[in-house]
């Protein structure tokens, strides 16, 4: 099934192109706090249930904590029961993907398309309409209410 998010999310402007951010490791360390740096730059994972964004129910936009790029709308969020903020889709052009081989089996990892900060992994156990679950580290996000 094809699913288009165009026009569904009022208040979200489509991105024509994304200018990459290129900062040194030292610059990232001075910009981010220790936990943000660990997750966004070192591909870490926060403890499940540790993010206040798990319980966030207001309408708004979830941005990358590293560069403020809008990644998800609250309309895409759902309670996966995993302990991490989860979304069934993402805003156009906001994410980049690669395969993560850190565990025994390969996983699809996603990053911010602008600053390449690590956000989480994609799983095929999400709700309709996509059947996908973008499992995000809450520390890697900033919530901006409408």
Segments predicted by a language model, with ranges:
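N-terminal export leaders
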Residues: 1-4
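Boundary at the C-terminal end of the N-terminal hydrophobic targeting segment
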Residues: 10-17
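A short Gly-Trp-Pro
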Residues: 19-20, 25-146
